[in-house]
Amino acid sequence: MSKFYDPSQPEQSYDSPKLFGIIPIKFIVSFLQLVSIVSQILWLYSENDKIYLVLLSVGIVLNVFTVVVFIKEHKLLMRAHYYSALIFTVVPFIYAVYTFISFIELFFGDKDITFNQCSPFAYAFIFLCIYIFYLAMCRVLIKASEFQPDDMPDLDTTQGLFHYNRDAYDGGERAKLMYGEV
């Protein structure tokens, strides 16, 4: 019976990392990126200011580029996206702190608190948690891609399905053949 995967050659097959051993992290990262693109497109249709339209259009193009980078697994651009997103974590963090401070002022104030007044803090906190989760998943994906070889080795399919023939590619004149000479 022919083998599709040779366990002595782990570089022939690259298994992506999984969250809790079930969900591929690449799927999670791509899903979160697509949700971001869809939300930006919806925001684009609700916005009337031309400056925001240009900024949202540029953001959509950059997010589509990022999705392609992560699908193609371009290591350098994945790292560049991760580090720039890490730097821009300051923006949602500052917004979350601002909404927390306004929530504290509201909580210790004299007025009654309603859910509508608490919801901006809750939304900011949920967004910040999802953003940090996204960055953590990107980091795991980048770490896993560092162990993946850039070029998969050549496979010799003439002597069996996906059996790696080291002797045929090491520069030697003689290769060991699995079949007899004719």
From Swiss-Prot:
Against InterPro entries, the record matches this protein to: DUF5373
- Keyword entries, A-Z: Membrane, Transmembrane, Transmembrane helix
- Residue stretches spanning the membrane: 19-39, 51-71, 87-107, 118-138
Q: Which GO terms describe its cellular component?
A: membrane
Coarsely, its chief localization is membrane
Q: Where in the cell is it found?
A: Membrane
Asked if the Swiss-Prot or TrEMBL record annotates the protein with the keyword Membrane, the reply is: yes
The membrane topology of this protein is: Multi-pass membrane protein
Specify whether Transmembrane helix is a keyword of the entry. yes
Superkingdom of this protein's organism:
Eukaryota
An example Pfam family from this entry, by short name, is DUF5373
Q: What is this protein called?
A: Uncharacterized protein C48B4.10
